[in-house]
């Protein structure tokens, strides 16, 4: 679906994968956000699909490279969001599939350690920090989850409504 204000020189929607790194703390469920390299905006670790890898695995790798987190990724996305990526001569509409990641380990240093900032925040704060409205909506939907929830894995596979 294209937006009404699509720039004339834009290409069709492209696909990316993202990780939604989560951990359980005494405050409740926390989300790991990273800054983008070009503009410094807060977002989730994301990137292009990787040849020879399933999308959920590519999302897991992006989380390790961009945020220094390791864990178990859901094989199914929890949702999607869209954003406009500015290129030299055009804007591309990107649809991003978001895969929850139950974080089991954080690294002291990682591939993009010196290129990005990392922040662990509650879902409601994460929703305020990101600039993509659809991603913010997805993060707000996680806000009611608290430490009393038995297991993050209950969030990993979305329940049908």
Placement of each model-derived feature along the sequence:
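Acidic, metal-coordinating catalytic segment for phosphate/diphosphate chemistry
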Residues: 1-26
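Short, solvent-exposed loop/turn segments that connect beta-strands within catalytic domains
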Residues: 24-30, 88-91
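Active-site-adjacent beta-strand/loop module that shapes the phosphate/pyrophosphate-binding cleft
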Residues: 80-109, 119
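Conserved Nudix-box catalytic region and its N-terminal flanking loop in Nudix hydrolases
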Residues: 28-70
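A short coil-to-beta-strand element that immediately follows conserved catalytic motifs
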Residues: 69-80
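Nudix hydrolase/Nudix homology domain
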Residues: 40-42, 108-161
């Amino acid at each position: 679906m294209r937006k009404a204000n699509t720039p004339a020189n834009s290409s069709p929607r492209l696909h990316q994968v993202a990780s939604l790194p989560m951990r359980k703390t005494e405050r409740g469920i926390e989300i790991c956000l990273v800054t983008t390299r070009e503009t410094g905006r807060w977002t989730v670790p994301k990137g292009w699909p990787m040849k020879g890898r399933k999308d959920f695995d590519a999302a897991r790798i992006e989380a390790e490279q961009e945020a220094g987190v390791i864990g178990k990724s859901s094989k199914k996305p929890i949702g999607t969001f869209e954003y406009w990526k500015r290129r030299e001569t055009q804007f591309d509409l990107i649809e991003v599939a978001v895969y929850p990641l139950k974080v089991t380990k954080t690294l002291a240093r990682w591939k993009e350690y010196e290129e990005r900032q990392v922040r662990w925040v509650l879902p409601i704060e994460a929703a305020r920090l990101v600039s993509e409205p659809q991603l913010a909506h997805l993060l707000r939907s996680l806000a009611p989850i608290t430490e009393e929830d038995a297991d993050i894995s209950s969030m990993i596979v979305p329940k049908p409504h």
